[in-house]
Amino acid sequence: MADAATLFFISLFGIVVKQHEAVFETAELAFSCAAFFGCCWALTRPYWGSALAGFACGASILCSNLLVGATVLVGCLMSHILVRGIGDTARKIFTTVAVAFITFGLWPLVAYLLAGVVAGDYFNLWAQRQIQIVGFFDPQEILWFVKHFIWYLCPAWPFAFWAIWMWRKNLTITHIALPLSFCCAWLIGFILSSDVAAETLLSVTIAPLCVLASFGLMACNRSTKSMLELFSVAIFTLALTGVWAYFIAWTLGFPPKMHWSILRLTADESVSHAHWTAILLALVLLVFWLYLCVRRLMRRPIRFWTGPWLSASGITVLWISAVCLFGPVIDSNRTYANIAREMSQELKTMHYVPGVDCVLAQTLPLSERGAIEWHSNISLTASESASCRFVVTHVSAKAQAKNPTKMAPGFVVLKSFRPRSDTRYLLGPAGPVLIEKQL
């Protein structure tokens, strides 16, 4: 059962989408899984497991927001109440809540000790933001959930629903009630969230959903298990075929339509130059996948988790192959290195002094400013009180094309931009940006 649940977790389509980026959803998923594991551990070690669950709840607040942490905490408390195990229920609940409060409380405590002057104002703003999050759910998030949950939670969700159906007359049994507690907590959090994406809250349900799916898989007949196996073979074989076809088109320039679609995703990498070791690794993985497919088609497996194994192997092979073959495309599509490089060159012509001068960038979000600073020696700030000699702002390429304008003296529009983006960067001396219409 543990093997099947782990393989279902690896094979989920949704979690692989953002795992290549340094985003908070990865930490949020890890702490949600830790909270679920703590509740499972509490069945045999009631207070150590409850303490781990409480720590994970507090850490979820620190890495995400108060609503996500409260949602995970509600799931833990519901599991303590509904699932019978050793230890006093009240003490387990108290342990979980206390450890969660202590874990979260370390943040404001250290902040007030080290920066007490500004900590009060900061946490007032933080509290206002958390209040804005709580409300009635956004109907647009329901549309997102209806459109995406089928592939986002594939292939686990059909087997999870089957497990609930098979044990529908005895939902209080441990292996059903415990994961269902977290799923119900997610539903409560989704209803009470007005400004949190449904995708963000779905991380709370991934681990319990995989556990439910493993029990549902065990309850399936042989033909249903074979459907998952053949589905995995067909889907990932087609996907790998597409990956290699696009790589060949990117390398040889044929077929032209496929080649053009790849060029649209990248600003600088017009010619494939994947490293030979990456290509060799992708070829080895392709041979490994074909071996798994042939072996499955030639033999009838006796292990009931063969379907999740094929699905997990397929998505792993597919993702590593895509990264190996299209690493330059992925980098150039997501990076700000080329923008930062050109901005640094233009500022040098404007006599920018590193370490002394700064660039006012009020229209650029914090993540964008941080990425540009990382790839250059430019100091960007959004503070109005800063005395900067230079300014950078966003302009629309479509608007400039429809309404040609003459820029104020000293201003330039950077030629570098992110692929398929309408945003361009206007750089020049600080002061009012005067734009005159061309006659």
Residue spans for each PLM region:
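Transmembrane-helix signature of polytopic, membrane-embedded enzymes
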Residues: 1-11, 29
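Extended, compositionally biased regions that are outside compact catalytic cores
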Residues: 1, 22-25, 147-148
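Specific aromatic-rich, kink-prone transmembrane helix
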Residues: 28-44, 209-212
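Short periplasmic/luminal acceptor-recognition loop of GT-C membrane glycosyltransferases, typified by
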Residues: 282-295, 303-432
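Membrane-interface transmembrane helices that cradle and orient dolichyl/undecaprenyl
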Residues: 35-52, 56-60, 217-220
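Membrane-interface catalytic loops of GT-C/OST-like multi-pass glycosylation enzymes that act
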Residues: 20-25, 191-206, 327-333
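Short acidic/glycine- and proline-prone juxtamembrane loop motifs at membrane-interface regions
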Residues: 14-28, 65-66
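Transmembrane-lumen/periplasm boundary regions of multi-pass, lipid-linked membrane glycan transferases
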Residues: 55-56, 61-200, 208-211, 215, ...
